[in-house]
């Protein structure tokens, strides 16, 4: 769809994976699980329903793989209460999630070996970036309940391929 060279994608994914610390939960295995779940959601309903265009779909995949990039291992409440550098930098607003976005984008823009969007139209790059930012910021647990409700509302109107898919989605969200 975007003709991104395979080697560039492999380079990018390898570098993103290296940016995941060995935390008990927010680690590369968790990122791969979220990426896989995003793939299942996209290909078992969202594309068929016309909910996603290509740029947004790419944004979903990138947000999934980057959503906990360089995670500190501490939750936002702890970072804010302890006045951590991340909390100070991001003015106590979703410090982890803002850091994940900023860190991942800093990485992606740092080398032509993994800067895949350089050949995209400016408008598409802006749409992609906005989607990634919105999706990663939505992973803040303070926003999770509202996001889950919204997701359930959208997915409940989607025509899923079978009852098992609907049960899986309802169990996850």
Region spans (language model):
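Divalent metal-dependent catalytic cores for phosphoryl transfer on phosphate-bearing substrates
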Residues: 56-173
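Acidic/His-rich, divalent-metal-binding segments that scaffold phosphate/diphosphate chemistry
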Residues: 1-95
